[in-house]
Amino acid sequence: MQLVSIFLFISFLFLLRKWKKYLNNSQTKKLPPGPWKLPFIGGMHHLAGGLPHRVLRDLAEKYGPLMHLQLGEVSAVVVTSPEMAKQVLKTHDIAFASRPKLLAMDIICYNRRDIAFSPYGDYWRQMRKICIMEVLSAKSVRSFSSIRHDEVVRLIDSIQPCFTSGELVNFTERIIWFTSSMTCRSAFGQVLKEQEVFIKLIREVISLAEGFDVADIFPSYKFLHGFGGAKQKLLNAHRKVDSIVEDVIKEHKKNLATRKSDDAIGGEDLVDALVRLMNDKSLQFPINNDNIKAVIIDLFAAGTETSSTTTVWAMAEMLKNPSVFAKAQAKVREAFRDKVTFDENDVEELKYLKLVIKETMRLHAPVPLLVPRECREETEINGYTIPVKTKVMVNVWALGRDPKYWDDAESFKPERFEQCSIDFIGNNFEYLPFGGGRRICPGISFGLANVYLPLAQLLYHFDWKLPTGMEPKDLDLTESAGITAARKGDLYLIATPHQP
């Protein structure tokens, strides 16, 4: 007991010293306004009991669109207006181009050797360029069209028997399986044998990567990092994921060794390309197994979670708004009335469906706080100082619901985009579902392709209804916690095959 008391006393003195240092620093710099703080934990108590993007939106209404928030020992700034977002993502983009350390990404992505969470620099540029060239470019995305077609056929075939048996369709589960299979075949060249386990592990990691864990708000207090159990869960998930991906890499190395040299580049998937580049002596940063694993996990997490989240939200919002659902389905069936099958080129003509997806991503940005940035150099914005190492969060969920920029902001109205030039590429700072600037998501084309085609096919081939006894007003649109804001709870529906 005496040893415990001594330990607690020493810890208290250490924390007190840190707190005094923070107070001295904050008094010498004009930080943005923010909510009141408590010793040691700062403003963490303001986030208790709510989803961070919602709580931070409410706080910003009181303290302003550039708000300071002390998260334990981490100084953070929250951006909640298009004007301030432009300052961070465009005007001072280079100053805010790096990423803060997050425990989940350090563990699961091999000390941030991925792309999304890698610090800004030459390594990030090299790996981003490789991934864009090999799998994320428009040309590469088009080359995967036959894979998407195959997976959509499998998706439709898996739903058909539910009508005969009277079983509800777990729409969420089917869409996650489609997007994960699509991503697997693009990255690995095949569906994983352990795909179900792999999906579960990646989703678990995503749920733990919110950035508000004890280790993320007290990074220098290593003795606290085990509290709450998140670190152990991440380590367990990492071991299992590492084993699965290691087997994939070994298989690709074996196949590459037996493949004819003149056929080495034709028909490559991402792992093939990365394995081949392991022997490229011209690379500034040589590629090893851990680099490949980190990039694979990155692509899989982003490619699966964001696309599936958007597709599920789109269906939920359409069923919540029956007139939108009826119009979207009618447009699809009218466009393909005389066709036995249709492909991605045909889907490009479905203008109303594109409006539905745009509106879905306005209300339900896949990553509501974007992936946080870190200030690389002291910067002044709107008369306030943003110190080096400040964590910067852009609340794109709040931007998409700001009544100053969106008429009837909380309502689902795809038609609002009809006479509007707003797009996904980060030039409109009131609408940033994929972020903006140097760290904009490089997989926009890949992600959207995995939403448009399956949603169009599902609207064409099935009549969708809520479970018996449930009205549109009863449909729950609550979000789950995590770095992504997926719908809380799986979406169960009745699917009746359509006979043209």
From Swiss-Prot:
Membrane spanning residue stretches: none
E.C. designation(s): 1.14.-.-
Record key words, sorted: Heme, Iron, Metal-binding, Monooxygenase, Oxidoreductase
GO molecular function per UniProt: heme binding; iron ion binding; monooxygenase activity; oxidoreductase activity, acting on paired donors, with incorporation or reduction of molecular oxygen
Enzyme class: oxidoreductase
Cofactors, names only: heme
Keyword Metal-binding: yes
Iron is among the record's keywords: yes
Domain of life: Eukaryota
Residues reported to bind heme: C441
SUPFAM superfamilies on file: Cytochrome P450 (SSF48264)
A Pfam family the protein falls into: p450
Similarity comment: family membership: Belongs to the cytochrome P450 family.
UniProt protein name: Cytochrome P450 71D7
